[in-house]
């Protein structure tokens, strides 16, 4: 019975998100333009000396297309404005009256919102990217096990991204303003997860440090698994890190929320 409540929250938020088709179309056009700019830049750099780079050109192109197709799933800046408004306005009191776990409800809503955004954008981007000329197109994974590993890391990455988002909501309950947290944490997360530059292009020492952070457990792993940059024992280690950080983020976020709810004061009248 308890699970049905969260399924209802998930379905409701998903249906709501699927209604924003015009915004999705506008976003798709922007993502195509950005993808082509990045891929053209890769071609220009790789033309001089392909062996000087840590990833093959095709792997970098695949990384770019997968990143853009699933951007809304992993982007750290995809936040739920309704939840932030609940915290700052005091309407969180209504949510606290419901016979549900607040953390689980917010987690369900946030995950559903990400999935609905991706559902509108991913397929068109993937289809068009696969039909482009060689060197600019998205190619399939090297084999079936790699594809299934990609799906597994995608699920774990999405769960980690949502847990990180929940951490921002919970910390906002302590500060009453998300502006500072968003400016610091979201910029840091976007850089350290490989959202600006893929982690293989980082200096070796910095890359190894970044790969151990919770940020790398989001989009970095599935993108690099798909492009063939992570395989074998490295892939197993990466999946283990994803599971580890998921537990840390969820348990830590839930504990922080419990502590925050003990001190909640609803102001206004």
Regions found by a protein language model. Give the residues of each.
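Hydrophobic transmembrane alpha-helices and immediately adjacent juxtamembrane helices
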Residues: 1-269
